[in-house]
Regions:
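Core dinuclear metal-dependent hydrolase active-site scaffold
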Residues: 1-63, 142-149
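Cap/insert and terminal regions of metallo-dependent hydrolase folds
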Residues: 42, 50-142
Length: 149
């Protein structure tokens, strides 16, 4: 679904995650992300998600993606979390699938629900950028303000 407000097109799209807001409503609502299409930028915010092939269609539907806010944390142990959260390697693949010009890692290092080491997501992304200079994927300390390029 899409809506336009103040020349910004806002599009909701499904992601792969569970939902619950109360004791008896598990998976009764749709979990998703948002695309913000402005005159200057097309921004994607994925929120919580696992990797899914449905994202391969999103690049075609949403057009050129200038910036993606991509989850990179809360992924270990994989036998539990793989259905709900991408790990950093899947986040990198998803950024490539979406052909995102710039990707920013979110959803890590703040609240510790899972067992991966605190800085592991950031370390994996930094190493991947060294190995692949075409990868434009940044992270920072949670809570810091960033400037959108």
């Amino acid at each position: 679904d899409s809506s336009v407000s103040n020349d910004i097109k806002i599009t909701f799209f499904p992601t792969k995650h569970w939902s619950a807001r109360g004791l008896f409503d598990r998976n009764q609502s749709l979990w998703g992300g948002w695309a913000l299409d402005t005159e200057r930028l097309n921004i994607l915010h994925l929120g919580d998600t696992a990797y899914d092939k449905m994202f391969l269609d999103y690049q075609d539907k949403l057009g050129s993606i200038d910036m993606t806010f991509m989850p990179i944390g809360s992924y270990f142990p994989r036998d539990i979390e793989a259905e709900y959260h991408v790990d950093p390697y899947e986040a990198i693949q998803l950024a490539k699938d979406l052909e995102s010009a710039y990707t920013y890692g979110i959803h890590w290092g703040g609240i510790f629900f899972t067992q991966e080491p605190t800085y592991e997501p950031q370390e994996i992304i930094k190493k991947a950028m060294i190995e692949d200079p075409t990868l434009n994927f940044e992270t920072s300390i949670p809570g810091i303000l960033i400037e959108i390029p």
